[in-house]
Regions:
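N-terminal beta1-alpha1-beta2 submodule of the flavodoxin-like/Rossmannoid cofactor-binding fold
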Residues: 1-82, 87-94, 99, 153-185
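Glycine-rich, flexible loop/turn motifs
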Residues: 45, 49, 100, 134, ...
Length: 185
């Protein structure tokens, strides 16, 4: 059974990301084809990237980087829950991704985004980043609109169609995560 991280990609006070990630996690827990774990960037307290050596070298000098690397390396696939800020992902998520390299390689990723336009532009940016990290990103995604999937822009209330989209995305993430296992052995 593969392990999938559901990564909360915002550290902002009052963030919607935690509720979105918990919704995805609750859906995922109904499955028996993978283990799912919530991973909150706030729990790692990563500063702005402060490693002297490039991540591709894998020589991490700080305890916070080593802890983050160990956590990320323990998974076979990822679901990134991201807000859209100014047509991109959050700075906190991009920073956390940039701390590491090999820990991401040859794994699968799916995306759940939210924002005034569903957060799709944040996902497009993340897809480019994933390619550089040798991560296979799946086609199915969830794009939650602050106008239709939230009440008062802050209380998550997704439609049944969004649940179907999440199921499709999880199906693909698990399938690709399993398929890529031989590349990681």
């Amino acid at each position: 059974v593969i392990k999938v991280a559901i990564i909360i990609g915002s550290t902002r006070p009052g963030r919607n990301g935690e509720a979105v990630a918990r919704w995805v996690h609750d859906l995922a827990l109904k499955r028996d084809d993978a283990e799912f774990e919530l991973v909150d960037l706030k729990d790692f307290d990563l500063p702005h990237l402060d490693e002297v050596m490039p991540a591709a070298m894998g020589r991490y000098s700080h305890p916070h980087t080593r802890a983050w690397a160990a956590k990320i390396a323990s998974f076979d696939a990822y679901v990134f829950v991201t807000p859209e800020y100014n047509h991109s992902t959050s700075g906190a998520l991009k920073n956390a991704i940039d701390f590491l390299y090999a820990e991401w390689n040859n794994k699968a990723a799916g995306f759940v985004s939210y924002g005034s336009n569903g957060g799709t532009r944040a996902v497009e940016h993340l897809r480019l980043v994933m390619g550089e990290l040798q991560v296979a990103d799946v086609r199915a995604q969830v794009a939650l609109s602050l106008f239709t999937d939230f009440e008062n822009f802050s209380v998550l209330n997704p439609s049944a169609e969004q649940e179907d989209a999440a199921t499709a995305m999880l199906d693909q993430v698990v399938a690709w995560g399993q398929a890529l296992c031989p590349l990681r052995t």
